[in-house]
Amino acid sequence: MSLVVCQPQINESFYQKDDMGGLSFLQSMSDITSIAQTKEDKAYVHPMEKRSVSKLNEKSLEMCTESLGTETGSESGDELSLLAFEATTTPRAPPRQLKPQEDTNLPDKTPPMSRNNSFPPPIKFVEDSKYNRMVRWLGEDGRIVVQAIRVSSPPSCFVSERGEGRLRLILTSESSLLSHNHEEEEEEETEEGIDEETSENLEGKSGNKKFSRFSRRCKENGREPKPMLTWKQQQFWVAT
């Protein structure tokens, strides 16, 4: 048989405290303060509350308001109240009245200026003269140069004629155009006289039952086709 002997557990800290002698009560007090500090550290405190604790209370503020020659600061409080009263009774300047701003979105009453979109721009001395000057514009170095040129003869115009199955455009002046129209009128008159004579011959021979065949060449533009005239002006051919 085995025997187990139970020995009492001895607390080392108890012996250490007994060894310290009269300083044991100080150690117990330090233990209590450390426990209290740990509890405070664990408890959450809002930072604003911490700041409020650090601020001065009403009594300390009253003590800070002491002025020279006084100890309690009662007179300084009266002076501060008087200054505050004067500040409230001082008249204030009336606020400025802002002028109403004009509406910039209103339509403009002035009529818009009429612009002449003609190109090239009109020149007075060119407009006055009928056949003495003409306007010519050229492109030089990316710019348009308008020049007034003296012209001795009147400006030319186009005349259209049909001949040999083609349409012919001729540049001619006003004088040649008038003479050309006069010649056409004379040719039409002569053709009308020839037509009247042929109709009379047919009526006279109708009794003998002999009819002469009315032969007439195809005419274009009221007249027979003529060979191309040698015009001095420049001619343009148009294919149809």
UniProtKB/Swiss-Prot annotation:
Compositionally biased intervals (Basic and acidic residues): 217-226
Biased composition (Acidic residues): 184-200
Region (Disordered) residue spans: 89-124, 177-229
Bias (Basic residues): 207-216
Tissues expressing the protein: Expressed in the shoot apex, stamens, carpels and young siliques. Detected in provascular and vascular tissue, and in the center of the vegetative and inflorescence meristems. Expressed in the funiculus. In roots and leaves, predominantly expressed in phloem.
Parts of the chain that traverse the membrane: none
GO biological process, one term: regulation of meristem growth
Residue span, FAF domain: 117-171
Task of the protein: Regulates the size of the shoot meristem by modulating the CLV3-WUS feedback loop. Can repress WUS but is under negative control by CLV3.
Family the UniProt entry places it in: Belongs to the fantastic four family.
The protein's name: Protein FANTASTIC FOUR 2
